[in-house]
């Protein structure tokens, strides 16, 4: 292959590193209205009255909107970026009289500059009826205090939701008699695991610019992963036709799932629609930390049974998830906690997976890389590590006895067959990379420091099978170059480059001959968006199919110009020539010009792809940590990982994805946490309090690949974006256990907890 599986530089790399104007705030007029939001100081309250009279008199203020400007009995909407009908409930109003978390929107203020808007915000007088809040998600289900008591709350999908019970979702599934299987096991691990909410903390905060175009339509330029879903969300929130909304995206300064929720879009859209003036809203870092869409807090009760020789026979999992004040992504994230952890163990005879998603008066949760699988894998993989210790077995040897194999029917994975899998090879590769045999379990380095290793496995999906859609449009231009139009959003991942590589491979042309345009709801073909690890696998397949069709048509038109049958010509990427006489040829440029002059053979195609399967990528990770038993400090000296993502379309970009995900997983394990005070106020409201590991906080990260070949993916590719965050959690927590002999069931694991555990043992 000439372009696929080659380490090309990102197409936008030079523009980014040289500081060219590519992000939203670089591209828009600076004299637009500034929009800011007045937010609730209470976790649960009703706005009795709101007085904006004085604030409206501030010079430069254009408009102030409150709940009185939004019909409270109107149909609600969701901000989740999901295919319609969304699994997430319709539980929001643009501005609701009932505020449900500290940071919920009370008023929208628009003015000519920040100074006047900030002054007006301080002059708005609000009288609240403060209500008792639901702040403990353990007590939320069937609590007499209802987060959503309203009658116009609506669930479009059969997910077991009931707002009168504070239930955003409930589900049960299983196979076999799990209780009987566990009763017959020699060893049963039975523990509850708890992962806290944590932030995506992308560099570019939420931001949106809106204007009215020549035809009176609302144009929205937003830092989003989901242009088509955002269009629907905006239209639903404003109660206007979708045909009146256009959404496009510039380059995006990071998303990691946060921008799969339309967090910022509806507010400037409302201002512009009402005033007919351009406006922008840019979240401060405080707002992005306290009123965004973080990972769901989850608690997982795992019962895992095995024989005395280490064969896992049954897994019983109950997950309780905290969706916060609104239900975005609640019903779908919780499913992955079981459906992306249990299938790793292909020899299990029975499983049961039950889940509840509850409303509380915390910040609304959303999508974050890993999307629920991260939490579930921490629980299940930690239980497997504990099983290995209980059986006095090497955790790697135990994994090799149990891992799902290619051709297996995967438990808890909707009856799907494993069509591509190099998981066992990944396990062996990581054992070699970290020098497991010499480092496991621990080594006392003296002076109170102990080094230890731990490992974990992970899987994810490749898109949402049978639901989400990827599309691509390809056309040959008049000078012999191609334009690829996509609806997927490049969030910095380099998908514009990888999709262009797929097209270039089929068309046998240099990568620079493919220009990429996207994503814009007016001109891009429909695409569900860049989430669920779908872009390479789903949109990539659409691109491959589209390029193949275009190649066929190029040959067909070339044959017509050469006056010979279509099956008598070949195409080498530059010319179409007659097979029997290669001197008879037409250049690509000649064919392009001919297509524009009286010919009926089109050289522009759109292809759409939906996959009935979601083949899992796999990853194995191992961590070496150094624990200071006096201070409790943990240093991650080395993290080694091996990934099976099928064929890596661009190995460099794939490796960078893995390294970034590993770093995020390390942060979730050791430092990152959202905590609330007794009144529901989040404490970590800036990056001073919310500790993200920097690159110099971590030692060496090594990533290798063991490639399987996925027959349903483009050139054998699967996904890479999400699986990479999942293994640090169980690997590091088990390494800490190997160092100090205390097992932790809650994340993050802090130095204080470690120091106290060591002191308690002494």
Identify the meaning behind each predicted range.
Residues 147-238, 403-481, 612, 683-697, ...:
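Helix-loop-helix junctions that connect adjacent transmembrane helices in secondary transporters/permeases
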Residues 1-162:
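Flexible, low-hydrophobicity surface segments
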Residues 67-68, 239-244, 274-279, 308, ...:
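C-terminal catalytic domains of large/alpha subunits in multi-subunit enzymes
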Residues 232, 253-276, 280-281, 495-503:
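Thiamine diphosphate
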Residues 462-524, 539:
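Catalytic phosphate/nucleotide-handling subdomain of diverse soluble enzymes
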Residues 6, 12-15, 82-85, 161-208, ...:
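Glycine-rich loop/linker segments at domain edges
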Residues 74-79, 120-123, 222, 231-233, ...:
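Short acidic, glycine/serine/threonine-rich loops at helix termini
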Residues 85, 97-98, 241-249, 273-284, ...:
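Conserved catalytic cysteine-centered active-site region
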